[in-house]
Amino acid sequence: MADFQTSTQRAKWIFTPQKLAERYKAANQRAVQMLEKCGTTQVEVDASGSLTYPKDKVGSGDQADKKLKPLSADEERFMRAFYEAKVQEVCSAFAFPHKIQATALQYFKRFYLQWSVMQHHPKEIMLTCVYAACKIEENHVSAEEIGKGINQDHRIILKYEMAVLQSLEFDLIVYAPYRAIEGFVNNMEEFLQARDDEIQKLESLLKGATAEADKVMLTDAPLLFPPGQLALASLRIANGVLGVIDFDRYLENIVSQPNSEHTTSELTKLLDNIEYLVKNYKCPSEKDMKHINRKLKSCLGHSSSHDESKKREKRSKHKSHRSSNDTPNGAPPPIG
């Protein structure tokens, strides 16, 4: 965790709430302007990472274009939240470590600071982020395996890889809260001078805090706070249920360390802010997403009639397939 202090994550990918909101608004506005100018927002990508932007439309009086409505910034936020939850689902399905899940989520979040969901569909970017996270964390899973495991075309995963890496500015090392949680729990053993029964309780706290960190990672918190503070917030939330340690006293012990950058009240306020984001987080349901998905398809130039014909073709193929096959199938980690 010491390396976080000199990392690109700290220097480039931690924002104030105001700056983060500005980045999202700017990405949305670029796509809105593209839709007005070109009648579509789809940015094509090839395997080398080269981008092809839509051309200006000829004639501005097209009635069909006037019906196109861009996604609002709030609708984009819902879309990102929906697919961030899907990142966790995919990682859980493959039993990937928490670190891969966290890295994939950070890649996804950072990508959409540069782009609108109206320009690159998050379903495709999500899978590429999972694949890229596996590579950087040295968990050797091929794009074919990921695609096959969730019934998606692996060529799309590979097609977007270079575009994703470029959008991340090749800042691929991600610091997540999980290792810091382990470090704090080890430090708590010393702080409590823990006996066997207390060590067992601390193990429960570690497990609970890890689950809470998964929730924290779905909020904007990873773009607003360093991983040490995310870890402490996760521990405090879990401890509120388990009651393993006097957490206020433990925070006082942390800020009394020579390298502490915060007072107890400052640190408590930071943890309160993280907990607020977790409490107010809402994952959109499939039902919530229906209207937004329809708008997104229009922006990307995917007509509903085309989608319906594809669905009919798929149903027809599925029906003929079924008829021919009768059987279905030490010291506390830094916090600043």
UniProtKB/Swiss-Prot annotation:
* Region annotated Disordered, chain positions: 297-336
Q: Which residues carry this modification: N-acetylalanine?
A: 2
The record's annotation in Pfam families points to:
Cyclin_C_2, Cyclin_N
User: What biological-process terms (Gene Ontology) are attached?
Assistant: cell division; reactive oxygen species metabolic process; regulation of DNA-templated transcription; regulation of response to water deprivation; regulation of stomatal movement; regulation of transcription by RNA polymerase II; response to blue light; response to water deprivation
* Composition bias type Basic residues, residue spans: 312-322
User: Is-annotated flag, keyword Nucleus?
Assistant: yes
Q: Where in the cell is it found?
A: Cytoplasm; Nucleus
Known InterPro entries for this protein?
Answer: Cyclin-like_dom, Cyclin-like_sf, Cyclin/Ssn8, Cyclin_C_2, Cyclin_N
The keyword Cell division is assigned to this record: yes
Q: Which UniProt keywords apply?
A: Acetylation, Cell cycle, Cell division, Cyclin, Cytoplasm, Nucleus
Example GO CC term: the record gives: nucleus
Q: Which GO terms describe its molecular function?
A: cyclin-dependent protein serine/threonine kinase regulator activity; protein kinase activity
Q: How does it assemble?
A: Interacts with CDKA-1, CDKD-2 and CDKD-3, but not CDKD-1 and CDKF-1.
What this chain does, per the record?
A: Associates with CDK-2 and CDK-3 and activates the CDK kinases.
Q: Which family does it belong to?
A: Belongs to the cyclin family.
Which protein are we looking at?
Answer: Cyclin-H1-1
Q: Which organism is it from?
A: Arabidopsis thaliana
Please state the gene responsible for encoding this protein.
CYCH1-1
